């Protein structure tokens, strides 16, 4: 067996309406949920790459994620463009929507902004920097692992 690509992410959420607004309106992800008749309270989103990349399932009354370092998912990354100008535009749109940026990092291979969704899941919004460099040598990502503050 060989994994070909990461297909989708499924998140449990406590408030589907709030999470649906965040991923659909704030992040601009296209919702593809058929509406009624799926048997449970959920919303699916796709960028058009595949049938769905994100599925939100409402689980009311579940415990919130613990804050800080913990086992399990740290964050997931969403590529939002190709240039720092697009990253700046995203930063400004997030600020206008009242979304707090919790980090901004130059990883060498990416420039990244970090935010949290309404349920506390961390999301990396990024652009690739010199994609040919890491495509030719994936190990370059770890050759200089120092994360630097990103100044946009």
Describe each PLM feature range:
Residues 12-54, 58:
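Core segments of cupin and vicinal oxygen chelate
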Residues 18, 22-25, 32-34, 56, ...:
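Catalytic cores of nucleotide-enabled group-transfer and carboxylate-activating enzymes in metabolic
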Residues 1-17, 76, 132-152:
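N-terminal beta-strand motif that seeds the catalytic metal site of vicinal oxygen chelate
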Residues 4, 40, 108-110:
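Loop/turn position at the start of each blade in beta-propeller repeats
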Residues 5-14, 65-152:
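Vicinal oxygen chelate
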Residues 7-10, 55, 77, 105, ...:
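Residues embedded in well-ordered beta-strands within globular domains across many folds
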């Amino acid at each position: 067996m060989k994994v070909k690509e990461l297909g989708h992410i499924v998140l449990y959420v406590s408030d589907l309406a709030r999470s649906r607004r965040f991923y659909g309106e704030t992040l601009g992800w296209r919702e593809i949920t058929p509406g009624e008749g799926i048997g449970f309270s959920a919303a699916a989103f796709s960028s058009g790459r595949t049938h769905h990349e994100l599925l939100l399932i409402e689980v009311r009354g579940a415990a919130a994620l613990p804050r800080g370092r913990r086992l399990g998912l740290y964050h997931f990354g969403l590529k939002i463009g190709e240039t720092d100008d697009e990253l700046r535009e995203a930063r400004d749109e997030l600020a206008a929507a009242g979304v707090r940026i919790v980090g901004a990092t130059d990883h060498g291979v990416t420039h990244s902004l970090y935010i949290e969704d309404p349920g506390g899941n961390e999301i990396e919004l990024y652009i690739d920097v010199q994609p040919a460099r890491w495509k030719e040598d994936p190990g370059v990502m770890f050759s200089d692992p120092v994360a630097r503050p990103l100044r946009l």
